[in-house]
Swiss-Prot record:
Homodimer. Pathway: Membrane lipid metabolism; glycerophospholipid metabolism. It is an enzyme of class 2 (transferase). The gene is pcrB. One of its GO terms (biological process) is glycerophospholipid biosynthetic process. SUPFAM superfamilies: FMN-linked oxidoreductases. The keyword Transport does not apply. Disruption phenotype: Cells lacking this gene show a cloggy growth and do not produce the dephosphorylated and acetylated derivatives of HepGP. This is Heptaprenylglyceryl phosphate synthase. GO terms for molecular function: heptaprenylglyceryl phosphate synthase activity; magnesium ion binding. NCBIfam families: GGGP-family, PRK04169.1-1, PRK04169.1-3. Keywords: Lipid biosynthesis, Lipid metabolism, Magnesium, Metal-binding, Phospholipid biosynthesis, Phospholipid metabolism, Transferase.
Length: 228
């Protein structure tokens, strides 16, 4: 079974966006620790299955980050289920977990399911709107949510700025209070220099939008983070 505490870099692919097969092959063989499939809108069973079938041709771990229960399909190595700690809607805090367990609990191994303590810190992003997150947060708010993740013993605390570069001081202070939760950071990582800078404080760097904006620059983040 895969151990997320050993990861340093992951790519996040949106099943609602197209990526040429040649680029997908390069990405999957880049040395990244995993490929996460997930998005905020337009996520369907069909496009998730299509993306998974392409990624599964390679050895890289393939993860589904669940944002729609109806889009859960078998065949992934891991299933990340986000608990959006700063959501105003209980469905996004624990409701989705209950629904997933009710629908698929008897079919899935508990070793394949990983709960993420999500903290969305960009109030203008699609993820904040989808999850009804109170995302206008200051540094103390973010650190407090990280402490909640520790309290709940969540294996992952995901600090999500979704498309914009977050406050690196917030990342530093968040990391300082986490002892058991692995810190995933996502948002605005578009080049090797920025990836390396944020990797000094986060356990795992998530590169998503950059894959579609400038593939070659996004690819260089792997070596920058992993020191290869």
């Amino acid at each position: 079974m895969y151990d997320v505490t050993e990861w340093k870099h992951v790519f996040k692919l949106d099943p609602n966006k197209d990526l040429p097969d040649e680029q997908l092959e390069i990405l999957c063989e880049s040395g990244t620790d995993a490929v996460i499939i997930g998005g905020s809108d337009g996520v369907t069973e069909d496009n998730v299955l299509r993306m998974m079938s392409k990624v599964r041709r390679f050895l890289v771990p393939c993860v589904l980050e669940v944002s729609a229960i109806e889009a859960i399909v078998p065949g992934f190595d891991l299933y990340f289920i986000p608990s959006v700690l700063n959501s105003k809607n209980a469905d996004w805090i624990v409701g989705m977990h209950q629904k997933a367990m009710k629908e698929y609990g008897e079919l899935m191994s508990m070793e394949e399911i990983v709960a993420e303590g999500y903290c969305i810190a960009n109030p203008d992003c699609k993820a904040a709107a989808l999850t009804e997150a109170d995302a206008d947060l200051n540094m103390d708010d973010i650190v407090a949510y990280a402490r909640v993740s520790e309290l709940l013993q969540l294996p992952i605390f995901y600090l999500e700025y979704s498309g914009v570069l977050g406050d690196i001081e917030a990342v530093k202070k968040t990391k300082a209070v986490l002892e058991t939760s692995t810190l995933f950071y996502g948002g605005g990582i578009k080049d090797a220099e920025t990836a390396k800078q944020y990797a000094e404080h986060a356990d795992v760097i998530v590169v998503g939008n950059a894959v579609y904006e400038d593939f070659d620059r996004a690819l260089k983040t792997v070596a920058a983070v992993k020191g290869e």
